[in-house]
Every structure is written in structure tokens, then in C-alpha cells.
Design a protein with these regions (language model features):
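Non-transmembrane, aqueous-exposed alpha-helical and coiled segments at domain scale
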Residues: 1-424
Length: 424
């Protein structure tokens, strides 16, 4: 048995979904262990292009069991809509290949309202939320003000529980934000329209995972977002509200006894960021727009243009440390093929001194990038399938990054398709 976690090293959007899709042929189970519908994992295969927000990226592989663990922000509405979308494109979803933890907390209808209302209140001080209700959800979860998916099997008790929560939440909606209150009729419609649809998939996934582990099954843990969005280790407060690290996988998956053998950290060949907060290497103007256009850098969930810049060695090295990565997948190297000279941020200039250490979040706004330039390769590399197929300049770029971040780069993606990969 071998367990592997695939995690983001930077701000998210690194290409984790395509790596999970690639590697699932070697695994029996894929588990999402944190986060919700606020980010997207893009997968391109023979069935088409998919932007998965809640579903694990193993759903395209026959024989793979996909699990939404107890650490996930389970949004029944978004999940059911996503399930319908992928099933309409020929992907089979049954209670045999998709299982939802009965201990996963449900993202309730008012969580999205609270998210949008708070971002509006913050105005120019907003965090850049995707407005999917993630922060209000996790806040309520830790206040024990949500319901568990398993409560769907106890409908009478569930309605009483929801009524109590609604009374409490309506006070905030009406008194703080001046918004309309919820009614039980609204919640009953939500239960019938969405929760009843996903109910057949809800089960004791912890027991399933323990049995899988005992039987020597290979388990792949799929993270959302990246190190710099982690609640504890990220650029606080411009983080998500969950732990995005491999260390959280055993807890959020429902298999606390899991031993993670390999941690594959996914790094984009340049930097991108969605949302607010310090972004030391940010490009602006025409230079940024050209990179954004070549990489099609628009949020999978929001469609917002992503902030872009050169690869940030300082932030990436920190992300590798946070994740305890054992190998790296470098994605979208092909996007840089248009550049004559390729910029790399090797250090930060902070308080008049160069540093290669990632600073405390409050200091980041004062950091300036120290840029080094590498020769571009100026040719199409999308057909490369071996290391020797890559031009010398591309090899030099990859090996420089590898040396600087202190972790071997095992995979290099040169295109969006499943087989557009170089394995070293």
C-alpha cells in the first residue's frame, strides 16, 4: 500500500486536478479532505474539459472510489449541480464510486449570503472572497453551528436542529446586515431540492477507508488551493478558512491513522494569484496581459482574471517546506514558450537587504522582487514526452528551479491534455 497527497505549493490554481487525473491510474481511492466549492480543479480528457469544484478528480477513472471527507465544506446545491453537469457529459456517478462522509458538515444557504454581505461591508478592505460561503461556513463549524450530512437520515431531528440554527443566524442577518431572514419553508425546499438528491451517496466513509487501508489499497489525497492560502501558514488574513497542507489529509479525510508516503507538490512555471493580499512578484500592464492571455489565467470558479507574475522562488521554497513535499510537478511550462527572456524572482529586497526567506505576512507589503533572467526557448514544446525532447533552455530553467527550492521535479507538464507530460 502507498498513500500519496497532491497539494498546491503556492496560491492555488497550480494544476492539481490534472495531476490527480494523471496519477489516479495507480490508485484505488481518491479523497478530497478540505475546502469547498470556492476553487476549481481543471481536468481535460477524452470526455471534455471539466472545472471540478467539489468532486474529486478521480471520477474519470473506472474502478476508482472517490470520497468527500469530513473536512470538506459540503455544499449540497453546488455539489448536486456539479454532479448533474459531469453526468450529462457521460461520467458515471453512483454510490459505489462516489461517497460522501456522514461527518461532513453542510454549507447552509445563508453561508453564501453572509459571505457576500461581509465582503460588501468591508468594501475596499475586502479579502477577495469567491463568495461561496467558505469563511462563514468554517466559522460556524467551529462554533458547532452547522449540521452533519449524516443528519439527513434523521429528518425530524434535523428540522428541529435547522430551526434552532435559523433563529440564531437570522439575528445576524437582520440586525447586523439589514438582510431578509430565512424561513423554515425556504430550508425545507433546500432540503428537498438538493440534500435529498445527494443523500444516497452519504455513508460512513471512515469505515470504508479503514477497510481499504487494511486491504492494502492505494489512497490518493487531493488538496484544494495551496500553501500560501493555508489558514495557519498562509498570507493571513488573505487565506482560505481551512488547512491546505498534506499534514491535514489524515484528519480531513476521515482516516487519522493514514501514513502519507509521498507528497507531490504542484508548482506552476510562473506565479498566479486570485484575490487580494500581497503578491510580491506581480506583473502589470501589457506584460501581465500577455502572460495571462497565453496561460488563459482566469479563475475556474469566478472567471476573474488572475494576477500573474514570474515564478517566485522565495514563496515556492517556503511552500515546499510547509507541505514537506517529496517531489514536484511543474505545470504549464509550455506557456512560457513565447518569451525571449524569462524572469525569475530569486530573492526579496526587504528593509534594504536581500533575503531568501519568506517573511511574516505583515512584512510582505514592503518586499520587492529581485529578478534574474533566463534565456527563453522560443519554440513549441507541447509535443515533448521525454526530458531529452525539451530544448536546452527549458531544461536549464527547470533544473535551476529544482536546485533553488530543494526538491526534485519529477513531472513537467507541457500542455493541458492528460498525456502532455514529461516524467523524469
Amino acid at each position: 500500500m502507498a498513500n500519496c497527497a497532491i497539494v498546491g505549493i503556492n496560491w492555488g490554481d497550480e494544476g492539481k486536478g490534472r495531476m490527480v487525473d494523471l496519477l489516479t491510474e495507480d490508485y484505488d481511492v481518491v479523497v478530497r479532505f478540505q475546502g469547498g466549492g470556492n476553487a476549481g480543479h481543471t481536468v481535460i480528457n477524452e470526455k471534455g474539459k471539466f472545472a471540478l469544484h467539489l468532486l474529486p478528480s478521480g471520477i474519470f477513472r473506472s474502478g476508482v472510489v472517490n470520497i468527500l471527507g469530513n473536512g470538506v465544506a459540503l455544499d449540497p446545491e453546488n455539489l448536486w449541480m456539479e454532479m448533474q453537469d459531469v453526468m450529462a457529459k457521460g461520467v458515471e456517478l453512483t454510490p459505489e464510486n462516489l461517497k460522501i462522509s456522514d461527518r461532513a458538515s453542510l454549507l447552509l444557504p445563508w453561508h453564501r449570503d453572509m459571505d457576500e454581505l461581509e465582503e460588501t461591508r468591508l468594501a475596499d478592505k475586502k479579502y477577495g472572497s469567491t463568495k461561496q460561503g467558505i469563511a462563514p461556513f468554517y466559522s460556524d463549524k467551529y462554533q458547532k453551528k452547522t449540521v452533519l450530512a449524516g443528519e439527513l437520515f434523521y429528518p425530524e431531528e434535523l428540522k428541529v436542529h435547522l430551526a434552532d440554527l435559523m433563529e440564531w443566524k437570522n439575528l445576524t442577518l437582520t440586525k447586523v446586515y439589514g438582510a431578509k431572514p430565512y424561513t423554515m419553508a425556504m430550508l425545507e425546499e433546500w432540503l428537498e431540492t438538493y440534500c435529498e438528491k445527494i443523500k444516497p451517496y452519504v455513508c460512513d466513509t471512515g469505515a470504508f477507508l479503514k477497510e481499504a487501508q487494511a486491504n492494502g489499497k492505494n489512497i490518493l489525497f487531493e488538496a484544494q488551493l495551496g500553501s500560501l492560502r493555508d489558514l495557519d501558514y498562509g498570507i493571513y488574513p488573505y487565506t482560505t478558512s481551512s488547512n491546505t497542507t498534506a499534514a491535514y489529509a489524515p484528519i480531513g479525510s476521515g482516516l487519522p491513522s493514514a501514513k502519507i508516503n509521498d507528497v507531490i507538490g504542484v508548482v506552476k512555471a510562473y506565479s498566479t494569484c486570485v484575490g487580494e493580499g500581497p503578491f510580491v512578484c506581480e506583473m502589470f500592464g501589457d506584460e501581465a496581459e500577455e502572460l495571462r492571455k497565453n496561460g488563459f489565467e482566469y479563475g475556474a470558479k469566478t472567471g476573474r482574471p488572475r494576477r500573474v507574475g514570474p515564478i517566485d522562488i522565495v514563496a515556492t521554497r517556503y511552500g515546499v517546506e510547509v507541505q514537506a513535499a517529496t517531489a514536484i510537478a511543474l505545470t504549464k511550462l509550455d506557456v512560457l514558450s513565447y518569451m525571449d527572456k524569462i524572469p525569475v524572482c530569486t530573492h526579496y529586497l526587504l528593509n534594504g537587504e536581500q533575503t531568501d526567506r519568506f517573511p511574516f505576512p505583515s512584512a510582505l507589503k514592503n518586499a520587492k522582487p529581485v529578478i534574474e533572467y533566463f534565456d527563453g526557448w522560443k519554440c513549441d514544446i507541447s509535443g515533448a514526452r521525454s526530458w531529452d525532447d525539451l530544448p536546452g533552455a527549458a531544461q536549464e530553467y527547470v533544473t535551476f528551479i529544482e536546485k533553488q527550492i530543494g526538491c526534485p521535479i519529477k513531472y513537467v507538464s507541457v500542455g493541458p491534455e492528460r498525456d502532455s507530460i514529461v516524467i523524469r
